[in-house]
Regions:
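Bacterial Sec-dependent N-terminal signal peptides
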Residues: 1-26
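Residues in flexible loops and secondary-structure boundaries
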Residues: 9-12, 34, 48, 105-110, ...
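A structural "domain/chain start" motif
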Residues: 18-79, 83-93, 110, 129, ...
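Proline-rich, low-complexity linker regions of envelope-associated factors in Gram-negative bacteria
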Residues: 63, 126, 146-149
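Surface-exposed short loop/turn segments
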Residues: 84-130, 141
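C-terminal/domain-edge helix-coil "capping" segments
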Residues: 141-185
């Protein structure tokens, strides 16, 4: 009986260690510019792998990689962040943000750096179809004393970089081709 309990304990501990996940909460920090003639109507996560957004390391000396995710999921976390922190033109054009890539990681060597990469398609919606207006991507890599605690800053930075790029583009002059999701494949 004792052996069975030990085996169950070790197996249970193994499951707990391997199922750990680092949740990242995007902090409220106002975006310094405002939308020029648009508002974010929706955020869609169209990444091929939606299981996580990368990894973070846990522990001081014996670092363990654990999956990282945005609290509430990518769509909800980014939409709520923009809703609270980005001054938008609610009388403007509704824009759908499609997240095609979002990845974070940490280097293992010294100095330890945190990395964030994002790719976003900015789209208009018409009769249930999306038409791409603009594509933006951003990458940032920065050292930090506690890299895992600063992932959210880097995620916000790459989101804002793409948003500013779209805001400064000539998106209003583009006539997109509209495709339903099933027609793309």
């Amino acid at each position: 009986m004792r052996a069975v309990l030990i085996i169950l304990f070790v197996f249970g501990l193994h499951q707990i260690v391997w199922s750990q996940e680092g949740l990242i909460i995007l902090q409220n920090e106002s975006i310094e510019f405002e939308a020029d003639g648009f508002y974010i109507n929706k955020v869609e996560d169209v990444r091929a792998n939606k299981e996580n957004i990368g990894f973070m390391q846990k522990g001081v000396f014996a670092k363990t990689k654990i999956d990282a995710n945005l609290k509430g999921g990518v769509e909800k976390a980014i939409y709520n962040y923009l809703k609270e922190n980005f001054r938008q033109d609610t009388n403007g054009v509704p824009i759908v943000i499609c997240i095609t890539q979002l990845e974070i990681s940490e280097s293992s060597g010294l100095p330890i750096t945190g990395k964030a990469k994002i790719k976003i398609d900015f789209c208009r919606e018409k009769n249930g179809s999306l038409g791409k207006l603009y594509n933006a991507e951003a990458y940032v890599e920065k050292p930090a004393v506690n890299v895992s605690k600063t992932h959210e800053e880097r995620i916000r930075e790459v989101i804002v970089s793409c948003l500013e790029s779209f805001n400064n583009s000539d998106w209003e002059s583009i006539s997109p081709m509209f495709f339903k999701e099933s027609e793309k494949n």
